[in-house]
Amino acid sequence: MGRVFKKKGGAKREAEEEKQEELVMRKKLRKEEEPEPVEDVEEDEDVSDEDDEDIDDEEEDEDEQNIMDFDFEAYPPSEDDRDGIVNMLTQTFLRTDIDLKAMSEGIIAKAPHGVVLTQAYDDEETEEDYMAYGLCTTVPLNDNKDDAPKFIKDLFTYVLNRAKKGAPTEIYKKIEEIQVSGDGKSALFVNERLLNFPTIVVPQIFGSIREDLSGFETKYKTIIYIQKLRIVETDGSEAKVGASSNGSSGVAGKKKGKMGKAEKKRAAAAALANAEIEFDNPEDRVLFEIKEGKEIHFDYPVHMDVEPGSKFHSTEKDGKKWNPFRRLVIMDDKRFDAFLKKGSDGIII
């Protein structure tokens, strides 16, 4: 079985000696191989039943032969992980003015809180062999309002600009309230993994974060979480939205006048609410199925921030075009804890 270790302190190389609790997982990746050349068999050549059975057995076992096991380690962020953490943060914050290096240093400073997921290594491998496969932690947003780090100010500028363009007024005002509160009871939840990384790691990682938070002296009351998702592009959606928001009666040529900003936002939100959605992190869907606590959110497009050809740009699947979006969620502590608990209990995805 592959293993995930949660190290509570010290260097990564000392995990075994520290005898910390083990978090158990298994990751299986399929390795595609070039097909073996098939020899032509003459039509008059006899092939025994036993030979046929051997061939069938080989085909049935092909998948097992191509399965590779990888061990992963999960441990608190350290200086060695700075570049990997930046890469993880870049998945959410595309082409922003946020100082992600400074944010990564802030995350490292909060260790042992948080989890960085990387492939296990042996003694012959070097630090250069490392890359981060996942990151899960919380970043306090307002525990030092009068002298907040620049990356925190940049973060609020970013989310406020996005909210101003596409969010209801209540969400914009809520973000402003969080920014000025200065009580240290609000945080950003970071939950990043490489695209299509197995969700089998979720229970162990969420359980670790939930355990960490239970020991915090100051409890978070409000959490901001920026999710990655894709939304199907619907032909003629703009026309439908315009007609619906204008209360069209179907009378040709009748004009209702220009839509105001608030109407446009409501119309856009209604269109997105009815569209097909896929979350990059499948567990994120559970957040909106939970009944405990409260949450508000809005979606905003990011395809203009992604290089064409990137795996994070628009994709085609089953004849549909899926455009990249971000969903900014603001939730209370009850919803957040229920989300972590659901994940740590082993949600079915």
From Swiss-Prot:
Residues 34-65 have a biased composition (Acidic residues). InterPro entries: BCP1_family. Residues 11-33 have a biased composition (Basic and acidic residues). GO terms for cellular component: nucleus. Residues 1-10 have a biased composition (Basic residues). Residues 1-65 are annotated as: Disordered. Belongs to the BCP1 family. This is Protein BCCIP homolog. The lineage of its organism: Eukaryota, Metazoa, Ecdysozoa, Nematoda, Chromadorea.
